[in-house]
């Protein structure tokens, strides 16, 4: 029986559809990678180590691909010709995913074209801190085995950059030891202090663990390590009591963790912003604030180190020095950047007692202050003042000669002097900018002067 007209139309239509679509030569759609996430544990089941490696690539920064073996890596978006960033978190009290990790990964992938691998060891880092410490060696071995798989794929040791947070910084150090210190870089974000301050260099992060090791210290009086552990060690705001963090224990968890986690947020901010988080070598924080360390000539030959992805932190000398303490001041919130200026006051006449002068920079309702102390029988004193706006945008400077007024007797002492300032690093004192006229100060009286500095 011949086909009816409707059947003929059906077959003809199907043939046309096949010719226009099925035979067009288009490849089937590329399957999307399966996205994985961090594990979650609790206080009772989080002590046994269980490691996941999650790969994030520039084309899909929000999707973590679970990569365990070589076949997983070959079938993923991993690119052996790019650099590899390995993020290792630290101790997790409650067994939860780090709140900062997603932002960190996305920011890192925006800042650089690289493979980013997050090491999830929630199982093994939860519960009791000392149990997590015991898992460090085993975790380091597992990470080393994983990195060996990358080397088989053609990755070079020097292209691997480990970023370790708190306890994760010492894990990174141990991994670096297993590779003979030939990994490219290790960044320790406030490396953990408990159990590590008195540990040997084989047991903790150390300058010998990679070609370049840096550490950012923000909580040296509590959860962070207080000793230098890298080639360059940034002691931010002296390494403790970060601005904007609670200073009293009644703030609870925030009091415990705010200073410690500031290193993470500083690093993320350094990746996001163009303003430099530049630091200056000095023997101590006190000496830095007193204006005794004005450049980076010793030991960096003028190349001041900076937080972020700049190669070797911007340090260009070889061989690299070790355990160099560098200091910087920050604001209380992102982007945290501060400019540092030297301020000097030269007395016209010597005095038989110390002279304390408060100096304040003003710009667009933003103020920054510092104190200059001139020792008795000395001509001048100096200090460091940090300001969020560029120096050339500061339009006024205020002075207050601080004196010990008594209730029954007002101090009417007057001093005269010359004020000068310069932006750090001060490599040439001829670049100092001085007020054109001497400053007359009476005890406890505020004096304002216009400040004009050209923008370069």
Swiss-Prot record:
Catalytic residue list: 166 (nucleophile), 190 (charge relay system), 260 (charge relay system)
Disulfide pattern: 245-258, 282-293, 296-304
Catalytic reaction equation(s): a 1,2-diacyl-sn-glycero-3-phospho-L-serine + H2O = a 2-acyl-sn-glycero-3-phospho-L-serine + a fatty acid + H(+); 1-hexadecanoyl-2-(5Z,8Z,11Z,14Z-eicosatetraenoyl)-sn-glycero-3-phospho-L-serine + H2O = 2-(5Z,8Z,11Z,14Z)-eicosatetraenoyl-sn-glycero-3-phospho-L-serine + hexadecanoate + H(+); a 1-acyl-sn-glycero-3-phospho-L-serine + H2O = sn-glycero-3-phospho-L-serine + a fatty acid + H(+)
Tissue: Widely expressed. Expressed in placenta, prostate and liver. Weakly or not expressed in skin, leukocytes, platelets, colon, spleen, lung, muscle and kidney.
A Pfam family matched in the record: Lipase
EC number(s) recorded for this UniProt protein: 3.1.1.111
Listed GO MF terms: phospholipase A1 activity
Positions annotated with a glycan in the UniProt record: 79, 365
Keywords: Disulfide bond, Glycoprotein, Hydrolase, Lipid degradation, Lipid metabolism, Secreted, Signal
Region (Involved in the recognition of diacyl-phospholipids) residue spans: 374-456
Location in the cell: Secreted
Keyword field contains Glycoprotein: yes
CC per GO annotation: acrosomal membrane; extracellular region; extracellular space
CDD domains linked: Pancreat_lipase_like (cd00707)
One GO biological process term: phosphatidylserine metabolic process
Family: Belongs to the AB hydrolase superfamily. Lipase family.
Record protein name field: Phospholipase A1 member A
């Amino acid at each position: 029986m011949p086909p009816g007209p409707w059947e003929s139309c059906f077959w003809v239509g199907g043939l046309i559809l096949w010719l226009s679509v099925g035979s067009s030569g288009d490849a089937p759609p590329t399957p999307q990678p399966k996205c994985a996430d961090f594990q979650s544990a609790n206080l009772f089941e989080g002590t046994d180590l269980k490691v996941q490696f999650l790969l994030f690539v520039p084309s899909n920064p929000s999707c973590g691909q679970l990569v365990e073996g070589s076949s997983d890596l070959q079938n993923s978006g991993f690119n052996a010709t790019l650099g590899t960033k390995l993020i290792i978190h630290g101790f997790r009290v409650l067994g939860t995913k780090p709140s900062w990790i997603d932002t960190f990964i996305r920011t890192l992938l925006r800042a650089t074209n690289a493979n980013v691998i997050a090491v999830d060891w929630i199982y093994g880092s939860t519960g009791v801190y000392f149990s997590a410490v015991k898992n460090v060696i085993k975790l380091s071995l597992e990470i080393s085995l994983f990195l060996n798989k990358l080397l088989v794929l053609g990755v070079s040791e020097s292209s691997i950059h480990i970023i370790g947070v708190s306890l994760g910084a010492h894990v990174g150090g141990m991994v670096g030891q297993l590779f003979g210190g030939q990994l490219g870089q290790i960044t320790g974000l406030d490396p953990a202090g408990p159990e590590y301050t008195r540990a040997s260099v084989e047991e903790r992060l150390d300058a010998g663990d990679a070609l370049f090791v840096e550490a950012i210290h923000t909580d040296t009086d509590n959860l962070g390590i207080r000793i230098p552990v890298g080639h360059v060690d940034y002691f931010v705001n002296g390494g403790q009591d970060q601005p904007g963090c609670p200073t009293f224990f009644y703030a609870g968890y925030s009091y415990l963790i705010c200073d410690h986690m500031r290193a993470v947020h500083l690093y993320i901010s350094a990746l996001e912003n163009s303003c430099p988080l530049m630091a200056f070598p000095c023997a101590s924080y006190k000496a830095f604030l007193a204006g005794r360390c004005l450049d980076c000539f010793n030991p960096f030959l003028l190349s001041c180190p900076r937080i972020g992805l700049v190669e070797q932190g911007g340090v260009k000398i070889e061989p690299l020095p070790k355990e160099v303490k560098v200091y910087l001041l920050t604001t209380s919130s992102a982007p945290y950047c501060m400019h540092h200026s030297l301020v000097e006051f030269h007395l016209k006449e010597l005095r038989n007692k110390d002279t304390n002068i408060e100096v304040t920079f003003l710009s667009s309702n933003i103020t920054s202050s510092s104190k200059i102390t001139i020792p008795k029988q000395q001509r001048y004193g100096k200090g460091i003042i940090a300001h969020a706006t560029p120096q050339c945008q500061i339009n006024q400077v205020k002075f207050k000669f601080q004196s010990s007024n008594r209730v029954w007797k007002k101090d009417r002492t007057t001093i005269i002097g010359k004020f000068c300032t310069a932006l750090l690093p001060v490599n040439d004192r001829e670049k100092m900018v001085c007020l054109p006229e001497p400053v007359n100060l009476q005890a406890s009286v505020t004096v304002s002067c216009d400040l004009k500095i050209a923008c370069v």
